């Protein structure tokens, strides 16, 4: 199974768990015990692919916890299953410097095998064939510069992207724009909005 967590949306509680309200004592002294989050229990009890997305957008506290998890394969007393694999993603690439991300220091990067993945327009068209309506696929195929913005990004301005084309297709399909009786003017207006 795949266990996915978006590090940018995690808090320390999402990473470590929350304290148990039951009173616990160890050798006669009060102690706090923790209820581990479900994803961590799963990754510790069975082999999974643990996918951590947007690690470079996580808070520093969460990143430090992920650092321990990836370095020692344990956190807060929980040990990952021996066959659990960890894969993480960051926002990089040619435009990575224009995203609001935290820079990863050499000690963090040293814990990973790093692959730079830059999908081409051909890669996207291959994926999109059959995933999006043919009219949009044909448009992108014949107007490839419209797939994704090139150049610098201005703040608060929306640009075309692979994700936005997929969302556009999903939205237009949900209102029947692509059917035989579809409103082609609406199709154009949605695409240029």
Per-segment meaning from a language model:
Residues 113-121, 184-193:
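Hydrophobic transmembrane alpha-helix bundles
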Residues 127-192:
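Conserved AAA+ ATPase small/helical "lid" subdomain
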């Amino acid at each position: 199974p795949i266990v996915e967590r978006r590090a940018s949306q995690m808090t320390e509680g999402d990473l470590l768990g929350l304290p148990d309200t039951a009173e616990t004592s160890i050798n006669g002294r009060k102690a706090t015990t923790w209820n581990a989050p479900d994803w961590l229990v799963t990754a510790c009890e069975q082999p999974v692919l643990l996918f951590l997305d947007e690690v470079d957008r996580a808070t520093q506290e969460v990143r430090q916890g992920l650092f321990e998890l990836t370095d020692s394969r344990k956190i807060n007393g929980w040990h990952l299953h021996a066959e659990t694999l960890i894969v993480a993603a960051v926002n990089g690439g040619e435009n990575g410097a224009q995203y609001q991300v935290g820079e990863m220091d050499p000690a963090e990067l040293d814990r990973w095998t790093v692959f730079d993945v830059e999908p081409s327009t051909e890669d996207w068209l291959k994926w999109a064939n059959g995933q999006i309506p043919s009219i949009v696929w044909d448009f992108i195929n014949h107007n490839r510069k419209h797939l994704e913005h090139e150049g610098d990004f201005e703040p608060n301005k929306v640009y075309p992207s692979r994700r936005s084309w997929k969302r556009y297709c999903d939205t237009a399909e949900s209102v029947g724009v692509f059917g035989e009786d579809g409103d082609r003017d609406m199709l154009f207006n949605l695409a240029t909005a």
